[in-house]
């Protein structure tokens, strides 16, 4: 790995630009990839429309194809270990959705997986409070950062809240990554309202 750019996409299969930008990507075991299109971010930053999307790039494919739409600011995304379920964060809804992954990579059976406002209380009432990026462990547990929440939630494959990791470094928890020895690394923006987005990386030991 040398950081060389292998390919770049600026539009989907219909030639449409990714409004709001590509937010997150998850790669399936077969080499296919799913990406979220966030939607417009207004100035001042007030949620404006529900037009987030999920795109799919087939193994060896050249074009990103829309496989889900009408998402309330599509954000983090992950594939279950058995490759049968796709999870996606709807940040503004403070909700995680799940889909069945079909053999051709398309998605079906859209449903609510976890309504985070029913699982955990937050002191922040920002309209942007909600799930950000996620990672899924080998047991199918979901670790999701909560933007404006200052925490990482651990959810079971059934949507049960298993643990809340409070992050003292700031309210803008954005992403998580697994490390050695069952450690979890968390990226954090100290103040989500700070236009400079000053942040840090936090290490949590023995999370799994």
Locations of the language-model features?
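Beta-strand initiation motifs
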Residues: 2-8, 60-65, 103-111, 160-163
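Short, solvent-exposed loop/turn segments at conserved positions within beta-propeller repeat blades
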Residues: 40-52, 91-94, 147-148, 193-197
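Beta-rich, blade/repeat-based domains predominating
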Residues: 13-34, 39-41, 48-53, 64-85, ...
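Glycine- and Gly-Pro-enriched alpha-helical subdomains that act as flexible
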Residues: 78-95, 99, 103
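Short, basic/aromatic-enriched C-terminal tail that caps enzymatic domains
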Residues: 190-208
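Short loop/turn segments immediately following beta-strands, especially the blade-tip
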Residues: 99-106, 205-208
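Loop/turn-rich, solvent-exposed surfaces of beta-rich toroidal or solenoidal domains
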Residues: 93-95, 99-101, 114-160
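A short loop-to-beta-strand structural motif that recurs across blades of beta-propeller domains
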Residues: 52-55, 95-97, 151-153, 198-202
